[in-house]
Curated annotation (Swiss-Prot):
HAMAP family: RecF (MF_00365). InterPro entries: DNA-binding_RecF (IPR001238), DNA-binding_RecF_CS (IPR018078), P-loop_NTPase (IPR027417), RecF/RecN/SMC_N (IPR003395), RecF_2 (IPR042174). Gene3D superfamilies: P-loop containing nucleotide triphosphate hydrolases, RecF/RecN/SMC, N-terminal domain. This is DNA replication and repair protein RecF. It holds the Pfam family SMC_N. PANTHER family: DNA REPLICATION AND REPAIR PROTEIN RECF. Signal peptide: none annotated. The gene is recF.
Length: 364
């Protein structure tokens, strides 16, 4: 798949922008704070409806504006697919082929993206929430049912936490109803994640071995508060853990077990990668990003769009070369950079856009 055209209105520092892309490599060149990353962010939002840089939609609005729109013309093997997102203070409207989508899970997955940004280098050592978000973003694009189950789980989780905070006199029967719903949706979320990580480990290990010259091996472990055993139904096990945690939950007035608390651990040659060297961290994150591309290709039969946000300067020459080797005419790629000196072995066929104070000009 590839994005032919992007139109922005009142997005960040862009009042209006209409830009056509190369189906292969597109480079946004300019100094910092000129608007390079904003364009990449808009592509990400077009794919996933939310930004990777902020949780607040208002941050995406141009100063003193109350609504914004992002439109794109996507090419897939099945044909052209117009995509539209309109954001206001009342919420968001998403359209595919000019038809309004009632559910988020009906929209996400039409345009798949893999983002590699400097903050991704914190994936291994950062907080568990980063690793949960990593799974949610990638898995949500290739499995709409996961988004639906996750949304339902979060809805019941919010209900349960609100109820725990609202009263000191608990209706045990009502709480048991919430627990049953939480266990049903939560067990599905956990199983989706485990299945995804098994595939990611398979693809990721290939990349780790390529980069390390077969000296390193990757294993991935999903760490959950719900004991995973083949002989016990996951829902029943979830309910057991909720029962064990009930006294704690009543005291702290929140839910202490479930996929919202889970984590992922990465191991290189059996050693937790949290304690690996900086070079190993970077190689591992690069391997995971390359694995995401191949995994999405296997599931969707099309390569995703690759977004590289000022990450090349964070990689040494060898890792840059390994990353740029993936950039072919079959993978549309967007790169932001302050200098072409950071880029090695660029393909001959590409577009370079100069960005200055929100103005975009294409190199001749």
């Amino acid at each position: 798949m590839w994005l032919e055209r992007l139109e922005l209105q009142h997005f960040r520092n862009y009042n209006q922008l209409d830009i056509e892309f190369h189906k292969g490599l597109n480079v946004f060149l300019g100094e910092n704070a000129q608007g390079k990353t904003n364009i990449l962010e808009s592509i990400y939002v077009l794919a996933l409806t939310r930004s990777h840089r902020t949780r607040t939609d208002k941050d995406l609005l141009q100063f003193q504006e109350k609504e914004l729109s992002i439109s794109g013309l996507l090419h897939r093997t099945s044909g052209k697919v117009p995509l539209d997102i309109h954001l206001t203070d009342k919420g968001r409207v998403t359209k595919v082929n000019h038809l309004k989508q009632a559910k988020l899970s009906n929209y996400i997955g039409h345009m798949n993206v893999v983002l590699f940004a400097p903050e991704d280098l914190q994936l291994i050592k950062g907080a568990p929430a980063l690793r949960r978000k990593f799974i949610d973003v990638e898995l949500g694009q290739i499995k709409p049912l996961y988004l639906s189950d996750l949304s339902n789980y979060n809805h019941v989780l919010k209900q349960r936490n609100t109820y725990l905070k609202s009263t000191d006199k608990i209706d045990e029967n009502f709480l048991s109803v919430l627990d049953q719903q939480l266990a049903e949706y939560g067990s599905r979320v956990i199983q989706h994640r485990i299945d995804f990580l098994k595939k990611l480990e398979e693809f990721g290990n290939r990349k780790v071995q390529e980069i390390s010259g077969n000296r390193e091996e990757l294993t991935i472990e999903y760490q959950t508060s719900i004991e995973l055993t083949d002989d016990v139904n996951l829902i029943d096990k979830f309910l057991t853990e909720l029962e064990k945690s009930r006294k704690r939950d009543l005291f702290k007035k929140n839910t202490g077990v479930g996929p919202h608390r889970d984590d992922v651990a990465f191991f290189i040659n059996g050693m937790n990668a949290h304690y690996a060297s900086q070079g190993q961290h970077r190689s591992l994150v690069l391997s995971l990003k390359l694995a995401e591309i191949e995994l999405m290709k296997e599931v969707t039969r099309e390569y995703p769009i690759l977004l590289l946000d000022d990450v090349m300067s964070e990689l040494d020459n060898n890792r840059q070369i390994k990353l740029l080797e993936t950039i072919t005419d079959t993978i549309q790629t967007f790169i932001t950079t302050t200098s072409l000196d950071h880029l090695h072995k660029l393909p001959d066929s590409l577009k370079i856009f100069h960005i200055e104070s929100g103005k975009v000009t294409e190199s001749e």
